[in-house]
Amino acid sequence: MASTWAIQAHMDQDERLEVKIEEKKYTTRQDWDLHKNNTHSREVFRQYFRQFCYQETSGPREALSRLRELCHQWLRPETHTKEQILELLVLEQFLTILPEELQAWVQEQHPESGEEVVTVLEDLERELDEPGEQVSAHTGEHEMFLQKMVPLGKEGEPSMPLQSMKAQLKYESPELESQQEQVLDVETGNEYGNLKQEVSEEMKPHGNTSSKFENDMSQSARCGETHEPEEITEEPSACSREDKQPTCDENGVSLTENSDHTEHQRICPGEKSYGCDDCGKTFSQHSHLTEHQRIHTGDRPYKCEECGKAFRGRTVLIRHKIIHTGEKPYKCNECGKAFGRWSALNQHQRLHTGEKHYHCNDCGKAFSQKAGLFHHIKIHTRDKPYQCTQCNKSFSRRSILTQHQGVHTGAKPYECNECGKAFVYNSSLVSHQEIHHKEKCYQCKECGKSFSQSGLIQHQRIHTGEKPYKCEVCEKAFIQRTSLTEHQRIHTGERPYKCDKCGKAFTQRSVLTEHQRIHTGERPYKCDECGNAFRGITSLIQHQRIHTGEKPYQCDECGKAFRQRRKTSYKEILLKNHSEPQAGVNLLLSSLIPEWQSCCRKDL
């Protein structure tokens, strides 16, 4: 494990030169050591803490004191908040429960939270599942990852497990490290050998623990075992160093060519030697640093040929292109819905499983997606940044504002595919579609029509005459709550539905829609008998009674029947009778009574 923070012996000339240049940025050797220590100390102290053994101390009090010290050095409560410390603990456990073949790959990305681990795994699974040619920058990484999952021997059969390879590497590492130090001293002098020794000494908080840690961090957790020098050192092999097949110092993967060795060392989890000058974040690969720096520079070199949108990374561009190709390779087994990204499918499947990972700290309500929690929190903060320019009403979500604006414009973007009926709100469309999608198993005993359960209850009020919704001002009652709401606007004077063309306002949305057809000239309701067209469905129904002879309105006094319940407008009466004022007044009074009830009022 010393190779984790030491300068590796098999680095090529360019890599060693890069480290030298990096070292010159610091004024003293102590500054350089401090920089290296800060980069790796948190992970080192975590491993010291987890693998600390009781046998290393003289008694329980010293053991407890040492554990507290190591935990303090790892979690750093003086600089981290409680939430950050909890996230570190969750992240550690998450990495621990991952399959061993995935741990090395995830740790190479150096995630700082559990969410970053999820993103790395989802991206990896998606890229490995994608058919065709992969991104060239990651091809070597994918091949290396597959090699780590199922390493093959000479005969093409699976070789020893990864854990066995690690154990073998542990026994071979002292000899190999000694030979690497000799090569390094020959090529570059003793400067880097001394630097490596200084860094190693600086990272030793307690004598025996460091030695134990360098021998094997992963195996020393089994407390009580003793590791004597003669037990961990093998006899030198008869073959020369040139005859040995090179292996990775981190996970023991065999490498056939020197070029593969160099590429693998760049991929394998190790030191983050590439640091960002702007924010100080470090990376293990230069390509990752280059892509990260575009956040500060604003550079977006990868441009979509279809829409011209630009991106910082090639992988993000590839994901974006799925929008144009329409490819949706990830399909839900429950409902058959397809998605362009695996992460989107994963989120969708929570609707079926009922998983809700995101909880509100204020009320405890849970959500399956982070966006849902984000919008919900605004209920508690009373944050309503989206304001309607027509009525100044504010909303917490832009989508709700867009739907609300349909009240003023009369727009109904949500249309039913079955019957063509349109709605302002998507929720109204969903409720309406239950009529088509749900089985109509509830039949009215009066007329034989079938409804859903809620629809039948509302329909039966027509036969029973029940009107549960009553106006508190005039005591008029209605079958539906929506009818009461529209009626109450007569008393309040509210006219929320305004015409954009002439400014005229209405109490009902349906009246506004019909009025707007005056400006557009639209007459969508056509009579099949004579071809006459009308702006509203009510006008068509009244007209069709001419052909059918239907007269549903009957006078209670004499029994005379009428086709419509029309009231003559006040303006029309006064204009027609301006020469005879008394007659106009009489007609005006009679107009207050429906046509089918005024036929017998001879006293007027």
Swiss-Prot record:
Which region ranges are annotated with the description Disordered? 204-267
Biased region (Polar residues) positions are 207-221
Q: Which domain of life is it from?
A: Eukaryota
User: What Pfam families does the database record attribute to this sequence?
Assistant: SCAN, zf-C2H2
Molecular function as annotated in GO: DNA-binding transcription factor activity, RNA polymerase II-specific; RNA polymerase II cis-regulatory region sequence-specific DNA binding; zinc ion binding
Q: Where in the cell is it found?
A: Nucleus
Q: Which InterPro entries match?
A: SCAN_dom, SCAN_sf, Znf_C2H2_sf, Znf_C2H2_type
**Can you list the disulfide-bonded cysteine pairs?**
none
Q: Report the principal subcellular site.
A: nucleus
Q: Where are the zinc fingers (C2H2-type)?
A: 274-296, 302-324, 330-352, 358-380, 386-408, 414-436, 442-463, 469-491, 497-519, 525-547, 553-578
Keyword line = DNA-binding, Isopeptide bond, Metal-binding, Nucleus, Repeat, Transcription, Transcription regulation, Ubl conjugation, Zinc, Zinc-finger
Summarizing the function annotation, the protein's role is: May be involved in transcriptional regulation.
- Record family assignment: Belongs to the krueppel C2H2-type zinc-finger protein family.
- This chain belongs to the protein called Zinc finger and SCAN domain-containing protein 12
Q: What is the name of the gene encoding this protein?
A: ZSCAN12
